[in-house]
Amino acid sequence: MSRVAKAPVIHSANVEVTFVDGVITVKGPKGILTQKINKLVNIQHSKESNKLEFSPASNDPMGWAQAGTARALVRNMVQGVTEGYTVTLELVGVGYRAQSKDKSISLSLGYSHSIEYDLPKGVTVETPNNTTILLKGVDKQVLGQIASEIRAFRPPEPYKGKGVKYAGEQIVRKEAKKK
């Protein structure tokens, strides 16, 4: 039995939550997010106390698991439309650079060509310096997917640690071969 679903999601007064036909919509100061919710989950919304409570719709064994998943998704949506999310990537290596443009980012990662990555709607990019990329947006899943795709262009290698890594990520280093 999940304990995640038992905790309510409390949102601020400037967040509007609607639940119609299995689709929940969260509207806040930074944007609007929608998510389809499993039919095994009941959602009770108390507008006076700005509280969302999740419970299983039936005695199905997967009910509490789905309720916990739905609660986590809705909590991420509420946090996204109020505060937003930021993912920081670091480029480690000689000549590795990033430049942000309007809706794309240009990466120079040691290949014979530079890589142009177009960003989807709702995601902004900043490059405070040549080796740091700041991705900002309201949808946590989309932001993580973009960061993962950018990291996949040149993942950190274990010998020198060169590549694209998340800020704060510890790269497990290997020792070089000894004669």
Swiss-Prot record:
Disulfide bonds: none annotated. Keywords: Ribonucleoprotein, Ribosomal protein, RNA-binding, rRNA-binding. One of its GO terms (biological process) is cytoplasmic translation. One of its GO terms (cellular component) is cytosolic large ribosomal subunit. SUPFAM superfamilies: Ribosomal protein L6. InterPro entries: Ribosomal_uL6-like, Ribosomal_uL6-like_a/b-dom_sf, Ribosomal_uL6_a/b-dom, Ribosomal_uL6_bac-type, Ribosomal_uL6_CS. GO terms for molecular function: rRNA binding; structural constituent of ribosome. It holds the Pfam family Ribosomal_L6. Belongs to the universal ribosomal protein uL6 family. Part of the 50S ribosomal subunit. This protein binds to the 23S rRNA, and is important in its secondary structure. It is located near the subunit interface in the base of the L7/L12 stalk, and near the tRNA binding site of the peptidyltransferase center. This is Large ribosomal subunit protein uL6. It comes from Legionella pneumophila subsp. pneumophila (strain Philadelphia 1 / ATCC 33152 / DSM 7513). The lineage of its organism: Bacteria, Pseudomonadati, Pseudomonadota, Gammaproteobacteria, Legionellales.
